[in-house]
């Protein structure tokens, strides 16, 4: 069984080196090219899908659309869930990463970005960036909407969705592609591969490059490779 993961193509805020999180930004032109290239590589590799999953953020949705279009699979059913959203960067969202490092120190910012259990500064209740002000989350219990997340909290929302919704599809023999974000995918990869809390700090997932897992009957990885050529 094969599972394909893809981080969205470069976004406008990736390009500007800003913390993005749940803020909804579009793909940059380079990100569009990355997504289209990913779709072409998937087609060349002969990978076919029966069902697709993505977040409710534009950059991931558009990446998936380009992938399906370029691989001639636009008809594949797509399921969108906030549980596949990027990690919520709290009060860091919209800030420049370099300027934040100069203000708080590179080590502190690295912990905020890569540590498993260090929370970023949280959004204030009345901050206009609060996701509760976004219509796409209007059906969620307000207590479920974060004001900031670390990777641990991100994993705690991603993995139940994997277990309850995505994994059963794979076990039924359906071929799955997931287009999501750097940290929601890091959380899933941590779970699939059993990566330790400290080791996960070093894991980087590139934008717009399909990651193919070959899974056994227990959905444990037996092989993985990037379609980067």
UniProtKB/Swiss-Prot annotation:
It comes from the Bacteria. It catalyses: (2R)-2-phosphoglycerate = (2R)-3-phosphoglycerate. GO terms for biological process: gluconeogenesis; glycolytic process. This is 2,3-bisphosphoglycerate-dependent phosphoglycerate mutase. It comes from Listeria monocytogenes serotype 4b (strain CLIP80459). Its EC number is 5.4.2.11. Substrate binds at residues 7-14, 20-21, 59, 86-89, 97, 113-114, 182-183. Pfam families: His_Phos_1. Pathway: Carbohydrate degradation; glycolysis; pyruvate from D-glyceraldehyde 3-phosphate: step 3/5. HAMAP family: PGAM_GpmA.
